[in-house]
Amino acid sequence: MKGGKRVQTARPNRINGEIRAQEVRLTGLEGEQLGIVSLREAIEKAEEAGVDLVEISPNAEPPVCRIMDYGKFLYEKSKSSKEQKKKQKVIQVKEIKFRPGTDEGDYQVKLRSLIRFLEDGDKAKITLRFRGREMAHQQIGMEVLNRVKDDLVELAVVEAFPTKIEGRQMIMVLAPKKKQ
C-alpha cells in the first residue's frame, strides 16, 4: 500500500511534553548540573536554547533530564553502535584437509593457507583423512599433524589434538596466538 500512514515507533527516551514528572534533575547543554527544577521551567530553558528536553533516566528520583538536540543525540548513538559492530570480529573456523601421503609441494601450499587463516584471526581445523590401507599406517598421520603443529608454533596454539582416530580421520584445531 503506497502513501499509507506510517506508524510512529516509540522513542527510547521521552522528550519535551512526553515527560510526566513534576520535578526533574536538569543537566545543561554542556553537561553542567542545573539542579532540581519544575518540568515547566526545564522545558522553557530548553526552548530558549532552541533544543529539546530529553528524559535520560526516568527511574531516578527525581528523573534526570538533559537539554540537548535530540536528533543529533540519536545520530551519535546510532553512529557509535555501528562503530562497535564494525570492531567486532566474527571468528570463523577454516578447514584444510591433509592425507598421510601429502607431498612436499602440496604441504607447503596448504601450510601457506593455514598461515593466512591464522594471521586473519580465524581458527584452523586440520583434517587428516585416511583411505583404504592407509588405516594401517596411523603413525604417518600423527607425524603429519605434529609437523604442522611444529611449523606453526610461532603463530598458533593447539586447541584440540587427536589422541585417537575418529572413524577414518584425525582432527586438530589451531587458534591464533594473542598479539601482545
Swiss-Prot record:
InterPro entries: T_IF-3_C_sf, T_IF-3_N_sf, Translation_initiation_fac3_CS, Translation_initiation_fac_3, Translation_initiation_fac_3_C, Translation_initiation_fac_3_N. The keyword Protein biosynthesis applies. The keyword Protein biosynthesis applies. One of its GO terms (molecular function) is translation initiation factor activity. The record marks 107, 110 as: Important for 30S binding. It holds the Pfam family IF3_C. It is found in: Cytoplasm. Its main location: cytoplasm. Keywords: Cytoplasm, Initiation factor, Protein biosynthesis. Signal peptide: none annotated. GO terms for cellular component: cytosol; membrane. Coiled coil: none annotated. One of its GO terms (biological process) is ribosome disassembly. IF-3 binds to the 30S ribosomal subunit and shifts the equilibrium between 70S ribosomes and their 50S and 30S subunits in favor of the free subunits, thus enhancing the availability of 30S subunits on which protein synthesis initiation begins. Belongs to the IF-3 family. Monomer. This is Translation initiation factor IF-3. The lineage of its organism: Bacteria, Pseudomonadati, Pseudomonadota, Gammaproteobacteria, Enterobacterales.
